[in-house]
Amino acid sequence: MAAMPPPATITPASHVGFDSITSQIERKQLKRGFQFNVICVGQTGLGKSTLINTIFASHLIDSKGRLQPDEPVRQTTEIQGVSHLIEENGVRLRLNIVDTPGYGDLVNNDRCWDPIVKYIKDQHSAYLRRELTAQRERYIPDTRIHCCLFFIQPSGHSLKPIDIVVLKKLSDVVNVVPVIAKSDTLTSEERLQFKERIKAEFAFHNLKMFPYDNDEYDDEERALNQQIKNLVPFAIVGSEKDIIINGKAVRGRQNRWGVINVEDEAHCEFIYLRNFLMRTHLQEMIETTSQIHYETFRAKQLLALKESSAHGPGGGASRPISPAADREMSRGSQRLGLNGY
């Protein structure tokens, strides 16, 4: 059967009103608010809590670092989630921040990534269970992780073998955004060379960082994503303290070499990271989590459930797990193929 030609565009003779649909969607979405879940992964003492507080210009989580120079670094002992409701110009954001144990801190770091990957998959599993209930909620509470901030130690050399393994495991299940922590410990030349070596390692090990390529992007979106890819990993500095520069209070740090202005692009790339996370790609991370990472997980789970049901008592004559789950499995498998998994 021949494909039908695309319909011609028609302009109504008078105003109909369906152009207000975007305003209708906006009103409903503003009333409901938005959910954003971020997980921070990295060794202890790299400023994970401080960066989150700097991004959102609010004290949201307590630092696990040292209060005094001679105090040993305090380690996060278990995966912890903290939730906040933030409002800006009438837009409400329900923010869930997940802090993780400082992986790589022990002598034996074998499979230290397992608890983190398990936590991310557990959120997918909880969402799937609610999605497949007979009387599904209209709005399912979403704890799926939308962004993983991965903190790289500013060694100036290269990624450690454990970094490569963990990045590979995480990039399979979540949107990973790598950052070079405390980049003010590097000179401008050292920072540039370090970034280039890390990019080369990403390419060599085929590590897929967010944002991803997508054939559906237009030229403007592709250009923006390329700019982001050129910056990854972001060399950042975080600070919750205000310092005075030229009579103006700014977020920054004072050290023996001088003053670091967190929002000065000549000093670090924090402003690019914040704009990327909050102003240009926030919705993209939420959609990618749902359409790629969660769909991949769901398709595998439903297929496993169906195969388990088929091999249960009675063998192949057993009934499918449920008509609804059967349909979901088919949909998930199709999307899995479309997304290249």
Name every feature range the model reports, one short phrase each.
Residues 12, 103-109, 117-161, 177-178, ...:
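Conserved Switch II/interswitch segment of TRAFAC-class P-loop GTPases
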Residues 62-65, 125-132, 209-212:
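Active-site phosphate-binding and catalytic loops of NTP-dependent enzymes
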Residues 25-27, 137, 222-223:
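Generic recognition of flexible, low-complexity loop/linker segments
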